[in-house]
Amino acid sequence: VILFNVKESEQQEKEPEEVQAEVTQNPETMTQTAESIEDKYKVFDTMSEDWGSDDLEGFVFYDLPEQYADKGYFPEKMQIYTRCLCKQYDVPYALVLAIIEQESGYEFDKTGDGGQSKGYMQIYEKWHTDRMQNLGCTDLMNPYQNVRVGIDFLSYLLKKYGTIQDTLAAYNYGEKGAREYLWSNGVYVYSYNTAIIQRMKEIEEVVGK
């Protein structure tokens, strides 16, 4: 910790009221902030909304849990798109929501592991270049492309391993990692897949299967 000694006469710290007054009196700053926020969410306008209307009978929109409402964002158009993909791939919708909650807290622009894992489903591009190419996806920070790649991967894992438990282990560790660090040591149930399966069941009570 570096400490600086500042003479009392040189201190420029302002009282909270002064700072608030400056912010309030600076409409240009407020406009720039509003524009930057608006720009951030423009990515959700990159997808047509004329798909999936025939598949939404009984669909229930999901309200984010309170602890994720501040930073998380999962608008209705994103929910519809995700639900349609899940039906197309035969992947449980509640499972995808539980994974998104665990991985990113519904933050579509979240990055982790030094920027390597990206988006809602925290996908590593280096492990999914072929999958992305096959799906025509080029940007994992685009929420629509992110969930498409993630759901496609989940579909592959579910078909290969047969259980949600093992699918989640392979999703979390990678297939090779799950074999080497979990299954070869007799570990099939652990904190990650247990937590997500529990949340999946809770979410199913709200949105259905």
PLM features: residue spans?
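N-terminal export signals and maturation junctions of secreted/periplasmic proteins
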Residues: 3-81
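Catalytic glycan-binding domains that act on GlcNAc-containing polysaccharides
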Residues: 47-209
